[in-house]
Amino acid sequence: MRLPGSEKVIVGYDLGSRYAQISCYVAGSGEEIRTLSSVAGSQVFTIPLALSKRQGVNQWFYGSEAVRYAQEEEGILVENLLKLARDGEPVQIDGTALDPVALLTLFLKRSLGLLSQVTNAEKIGALMITCEELDSRMLEVLAAATAGLHLKTEQICFQSHVESFYYYNLYQPEELWRHKTVLCEYAEHSIRTYCMECNRHTTPVVAYMEEREFPFPVPESDEKMLEIATSLCGNQIVSSVYLIGEAFSQEWMKESLRYLCHGRRVFQGNNLFSKGACYSMMELSLIHI
């Protein structure tokens, strides 16, 4: 649905190490937060964090199109954009040294073009970018990258995945976070977990968060996943479990999934962090929602 020109959009942008995701809320619409598909007419929410350049020509592609073009047309593929920007070393592409932060800005700009599904980037009223860790160097990189977007708003903020998980939880029905809430994120060689528990007897409610990382050397190991699940949920009340990452699957999670589903609500998806960033920005922004 196209929007009347006066309405602003609040954007939650999850900037991961390999993928990005974008969720948005149309201020004043009363609609739910929407996660943008990277492929028209589909439910593909993950955007590969990659660019590719056509050799000899200043023509760039991003996301899955960048990967495809590099494979089929011998384009120059540039991945790990966030790491490259953080490291700060010039990137040699097609005989030219390029600023890695400028490459990240290009990716952000192109991917925000997905807002054309509901509006356009000029209607961004507030932007929250969330990433795994947020130290001083990452803040410096994100500030520089977003400055290059020249958005018509000063409401640009950054937060960690932990904070996005917190805000996502607060906007869910209370029965899902009445007791402990567990998030498991499938990383490359590990399972990263966040456990949140709220003390509802305080005003305001105080949330306790614990981060852990479990080695996961053998991909799709049901036995190892069951061991992790038992460590996280054993001998305590857990209201809900979120499995983040496309690698989680019922095909290999037999006993571990059966254990997790026993007396708990279990959800699988990929857009929790971008939605949490959007919920957070809805609270922080000066836009009437």
Sequence positions of predicted segments:
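A short acidic (Asp/Glu
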Residues: 22-23, 137-143, 167-171, 191-196, ...
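Conserved phosphate-binding loops in N-terminal lobes of ATP-dependent enzymes
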Residues: 37-130, 212-226, 231, 238
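Glycine-rich phosphate-binding loops at beta-strand->alpha-helix junctions
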Residues: 127-139, 230-257
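ATP/nucleotide-binding catalytic cores
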Residues: 142-150, 167, 173, 179-183, ...
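Short, flexible helix-coil linker/hinge segments at the edges of structured domains or between repeats
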Residues: 151-170, 175-176, 190-223
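Conserved small/polar residues in nucleotide/adenosyl-binding loops
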Residues: 287-289
